[in-house]
Amino acid sequence: MKMSRSEHSLQALSWRKLYLSRAKLKASSRTSALLSGFAMVAMVEVQLDTNHDYPPGLLIAFSACTTVLVAVHLFALMVSTCILPNIEAVSNVHNLNSVKESPHERMHRHIELAWAFSTVIGTLLFLAGVVLLCWVKFLPIKPKGQKNGTVSAGVAAAITSTSIMVPFGLVFIVFAVHFYRSLVSHKTDRQFQELEELEDLQNELDHREEVSTLQSPGSLYP
């Protein structure tokens, strides 16, 4: 059975959505596994100086940031692990109609949530964790005999890392907002194109019904 141009376009659109969902899940799983692993290693390997009096807020912030970071990435990894095999199974079948068996349409919100957690929220938490780790690591470093009024080398190193990471974090936020707005605009344009394709398909189906009605024997001999 041959497909019309509109039907073929709808099939191509469905497959494009499937491949996009699969790519997002793969990117989320790789990014989440990598960043959560780094966060866990940083928390385990950091060596606190027991002779130094750390500010309680610094330790609480570092612990909370690392824990939330791991939890966010594990959630994204869990969603990717649960949904990705079902999409992979459908994408490996060489049948155009098999795209209807994929759960990517029903699980669209979960896929977008996992992608946002992994690439946006998780990355921001990772940047914040790097800054807090620098403060925890470098704050106790202080040469012997240094006066209390001067800035120690450890504090200077922590301030330097913070001053570098904060502008980079702002640039990342601006880029994320700009990318999201561009993506929404692109999706809006695609929605209009899909509506036009559906309208063309409906007109084509109506035309087929009219032709079949005119060619039927009952229409020629009442």
Curated annotation (Swiss-Prot):
Q: Membrane spanning segments where?
A: 31-48, 59-79, 113-133, 155-175
Q: Which residues lie on this side of the membrane: Cytoplasmic?
A: 1-30, 80-112, 176-222
Extracellular face of the membrane: 49-58, 134-154
Topology within the bilayer? Multi-pass membrane protein
Where does the UniProt entry say this protein principally localizes?
A: membrane
| Biological process, per Gene Ontology | adaptive immune response; positive regulation of calcium ion transport; sarcomere organization; store-operated calcium entry
Q: Which residues are glycosylated?
A: 148
What keywords are assigned to this protein?
Adaptive immunity, Calcium, Calcium channel, Calcium transport, Cell membrane, Glycoprotein, Immunity, Ion channel, Ion transport, Membrane, Transmembrane, Transmembrane helix, Transport
**Presence of the UniProt keyword Membrane in the record:** yes
Per UniProt, subcellular location reads as: Cell membrane
What exactly does this protein do?
Ca(2+) release-activated Ca(2+) (CRAC) channel subunit which mediates Ca(2+) influx following depletion of intracellular Ca(2+) stores.
Would you tell me the protein name for this molecule?
A: Calcium release-activated calcium channel protein 1
From the UniProt record, report the name of the gene that encodes this protein: orai1
